Amino acid sequence: MSSAIENWHLCIEKNIVDASFMDQDIEFYSPFVYKPIQGIENVMNYLNAANQVINNKHFKYTDEIVGEGSAFLIFETKIEEIYINGVYYIIWNEEQKLTELRVLIRPFKALTLVAETMSKHL
């Protein structure tokens, strides 16, 4: 069985979002939305939009901290020449399915740009 983190990296590498790696009750904490986004279908909508915006030719991981059931993935990318630095915090269960995903983005100018650009894909 592939690990949750291997599955995540495969999705990023292939620029796809795969619901089979998610628990039915997954929660996504977006930097733009006050309440967590719940359920595979809703989370898929946001991840597909984020994938189109953030996962571009400039996207790269700069660090990774992986534990038994969670990981911090630090990334960098650019949109319209604006530097973006962010963190994915991912939690998974014993079945290697994602149960929680949190995204943090900085600086504020980048956060605003990502929000505006993603809203066009939602």
Question: Where does each model-flagged region fall?
Answer:
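C-terminal and inter-domain tail/linker signature
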Residues: 1-122
